[in-house]
Amino acid sequence: RIRQPEVTRQRILDAAVVEFSSRGLGGARIDAIARRARTNKRMIYHYFGNKDDLFLAALESTYEHMRRMEGDLRLEHIEPLAAMRKLVRFTFNYFLDNQHFVALLNSENLHQAAHIKRSRRVKPINYPLIETLDRLLCRGEAAGQFHSGIDALQLYISIAGVCYFYFSNIHTLS
């Protein structure tokens, strides 16, 4: 049998995203993740240490995926107002198409961001988007499309918040 550590690790991560998003941190079971990943618990502990670290890795991987997809938008090559519209549309559609991301965020929020606070990867993952947004705002301000003094981070929090709210509360709003 050929060992493929990166393939096994990714299968575990993919299985963890599904389990954690459907059952939450407390409800997800390592046995179920191992079954879904077609591996054993020992491999999960080998690659990720413990359940909390696996949850953090799942969260980080979903952030990385979203940021990679945002990078593919190439917003810096688009007129500022059109780029902003594209980002808002993308964010809404990303949450629509990736409900597991919303579910993982809900679970992490229940734990008061205890895992994300330990992450050394999430902030650096987010910086490029905020920097791109800041450049868009500057270009848009110079073109008379945006007001001056808009904070890129606060704007993104607003965009993500509006899009996230709908999906995180869809069951109680209907």
How would you name each of these model-derived features?
Residues 19, 94, 136:
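Short alpha-helical functional segments enriched in proximate histidine and acidic residues
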Residues 22-26, 76-77, 98, 143:
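Short coil/turn segments at alpha/beta junctions that flank glycine-rich nucleotide-binding fingerprints
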Residues 2, 9-10, 30, 52, ...:
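Short, structured helix-loop boundary elements
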Residues 71-103, 124-126, 130, 152-159:
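Hydrophobic alpha-helical connector segments
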Residues 11, 19-53, 57-58:
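Helix-turn-helix
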Residues 100-104, 117-119, 123, 139-174:
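Hydrophobic/aromatic-rich alpha-helical bundle segments in the mid-to-C-terminal region
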Residues 48, 107-113:
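Short helix-capping/turn signature of helix-turn-helix
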Residues 8-16, 33, 58-62, 66, ...:
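Generic hydrophobic, amphipathic alpha-helix propensity
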